[in-house]
C-alpha cells in the first residue's frame, strides 16, 4: 500500500523510528505538548492524533492506537511496514488481576496471553506466544530503577472483550499468575514479530478487577507520567 494510508496522512520521514502509542489520542496530544520539544502534528485522520518532536535530543513520535487489537493491529502494522518504524512502545491502562498489583502501579508486559484469534492469519502449525523485545524490556526496567519507580514485570492478557459475559474469566487468568488485563499488547507483539521489529507494553493500573478501585477517565489522560517517562 502507498502512503499516506487511509488512516494516516503522514509522509515518509514524518514519523520517528521510535513511536509511543497510547490508546487514547488525547493522551498522545498530552504527551506531545508536555514532553516533546517542537512537536509537529502529522496525523488527524479519525482524530487519531500523531506528533513528532524531540525528547532529550532524540527524535520521538507519539500516536494514538485506539481501543482493541483490530485498531492497534492497523496502526502498528502501517507504522512498521509502511513508515519504517523500528520500535513501538504501547503505553496504556490495564485492570489488575493480582492482589499485589495496585491502582497506579506500573506493569512492564514481558508477554501477552490472548483470547483473540488475531494470530490465525499467520497459519502457524501451533500457538504463537506474543512476546515483547527483550532489549526494550531490559531497558525499561533499568530506566524505572534509575527513576526510583517500582514496576511489575511479567505476563498480561490482551482480551477482545471488555464486558465479559463470563464472570469466571478474570479468575482463570488470575490463577495463571497473569498480572493484569488490557486489549492491545498481543496484536502489537505479533505485528512486531512478523515485521522483524521491536515492541513493548508499559501499562499503568487504572482499576482493580477484584477490588472496587478505579481512577477517572480524565486522570487516565494526564496522570500516567511515570509510565510515560519510562517509555520516553
PLM regions and their residue ranges:
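Metabolite-binding pocket within alpha/beta catalytic cores that recognizes anionic/polar moieties
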Residues: 1-128, 134-135
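Glycine-rich beta-alpha junction loops
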Residues: 25, 95, 157-161, 187, ...
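Expand to "…catalyze enediolate/carbanion chemistry for C-C bond making/breaking, isomerization
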Residues: 81, 165, 194, 202, ...
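Active-site rim beta-loop-alpha module in soluble metabolic enzymes
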Residues: 127-176
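A C-terminal functional module that forms or caps the active site or interfaces directly
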Residues: 167-206
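His/Asp/Glu-rich mid-to-C-terminal helical/loop segments that flank catalytic regions of hydrolases
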Residues: 209-232
Amino acid at each position: 500500500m502507498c502512503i499516506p494510508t487511509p488512516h494516516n496522512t503522514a509522509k515518509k520521514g514524518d514519523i520517528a523510528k521510535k513511536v509511543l502509542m497510547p490508546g487514547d489520542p488525547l493522551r498522545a496530544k498530552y504527551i506531545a505538548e508536555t514532553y516533546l520539544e517542537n512537536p509537529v502534528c502529522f496525523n488527524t485522520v479519525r482524530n487519531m492524533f500523531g506528533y513528532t518532536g524531540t525528547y532529550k535530543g532524540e527524535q520521538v513520535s507519539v500516536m494514538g492506537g485506539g481501543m482493541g487489537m483490530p485498531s492497534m493491529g492497523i496502526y502498528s502494522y502501517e507504522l512498521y511496514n509502511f513508515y519504517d518504524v523500528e520500535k513501538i512502545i504501547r503505553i496504556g491502562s490495564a485492570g489488575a488481576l493480582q492482589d499485589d498489583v495496585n491502582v497506579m502501579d506500573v506493569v512492564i508486559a514481558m508477554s501477552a496471553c490472548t483470547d483473540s484469534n488475531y494470530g490465525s492469519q499467520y497459519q502457524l502449525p501451533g500457538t504463537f506466544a506474543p512476546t515483547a523485545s527483550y532489549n526494550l524490556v531490559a531497558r525499561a526496567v533499568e530506566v524505572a530503577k534509575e527513576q526510583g519507580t517500582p514496576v511489575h514485570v511479567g505476563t498480561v492478557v490482551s482480551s477482545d472483550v471488555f464486558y465479559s459475559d463470563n464472570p469466571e474469566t478474570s479468575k482463570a487468568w488470575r490463577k495463571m499468575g497473569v498480572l493484569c488485563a488490557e486489549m492491545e499488547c498481543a496484536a502489537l507483539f505479533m505485528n512486531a514479530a512478523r515485521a522483524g521489529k521491536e515492541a513493548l507494553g508499559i501499562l499503568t493500573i487504572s482499576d482493580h478487577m477484584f477490588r472496587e478501585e478505579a481512577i477517572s477517565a480524565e486522570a487516565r489522560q494526564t496522570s500516567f507520567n511515570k509510565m510515560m517517562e519510562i517509555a520516553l
